[in-house]
């Protein structure tokens, strides 16, 4: 049984095809659901909840970031929960939207010396946790969220993306 009902939109020709991205996202987000559910960190509905993923470019995500967050710049990932939810509480049937910008991800992979797939995996997990109410606005929240990211990524065979870094809090 699928862990999530994943809907994908590809708005930039630089991304792989929809089938490739869907398979990738099912593996990554499926692992996140299994870890969160089995570790009793997060309950999930019996029916697979829906998440919408948009794979776009820097110009599009910059427009969205300016409109919804008042930040007129491109960013790697934006998450828009469909409904307010607190971490560890049952989400609704529609989790929300995750939007990822290809050019920013590509630049960051060079800066971080990571593979594109590994960095994209991290951003998908990060965005997914935001849909479940997790955040990093203060050090306590950041510690919880980054700890979950690290453990989920470990389930996928990836190393700690925060190793040797300070907690990443929003300004």
Swiss-Prot record:
Membership in a protein family: Belongs to the endoribonuclease YbeY family.
Molecular-function GO term, any one: metalloendopeptidase activity
Function, as annotated: Single strand-specific metallo-endoribonuclease involved in late-stage 70S ribosome quality control and in maturation of the 3' terminus of the 16S rRNA.
E.C. number: 3.1.-.-
Annotated disulfide bonds: none
Zinc keyword on record: yes
Protein name: Endoribonuclease YbeY
